[in-house]
Amino acid sequence: MNMTLNKRWCLTAILALSAVVYTSSSFAATDRLVIESGDSAQSRQQASMEKEQWNDTRSLRQKVNKRAEKEWDKTDVAFDAQDNCQKSANVNAYWEPNTLRCLDRRTGRAINP
């Protein structure tokens, strides 16, 4: 029994040693360090295409921004006009919400309060 236990320990030690030798021999020699900056031809081409697409959509973005700014200006002017119409001393002036104008009650014409 004691003999078989020694054989098992010996066999286990030999297997462990051979596994260490086998794995150490399978590693590649790493005496060089290669550092890539990520600046490859493919990444430059992709960046160029993204820049081109951004430039192509620039005029569209500017149009959308101008339209939004015009709508905001129109709303702002209408709000000020409504406020002025309601504060007017002219009792015949009233605010027409559909046309966003200050009108005279008697004539229906636009007035400047």
UniProtKB/Swiss-Prot annotation:
Q: Which family does it belong to?
A: Belongs to the UPF0482 family.
Which NCBIfam families does this one have?
A: PRK13659.1
Signal keyword on record:
yes
Record organism: Klebsiella pneumoniae (strain 342)
One Pfam family matching this protein:
DUF1283
Q: Does the keyword Transmembrane apply?
A: no
Annotated region Disordered: the residues are 38-61
Keywords, sorted A to Z:
Signal
Ranges of Basic and acidic residues composition bias in the record: 49-59
> Signal peptide span per the entry?
1-28
List each coiled-coil range.
Answer: none
* Protein's recorded name: UPF0482 protein KPK_2871
Q: Where is the composition biased (Polar residues)?
A: 39-48
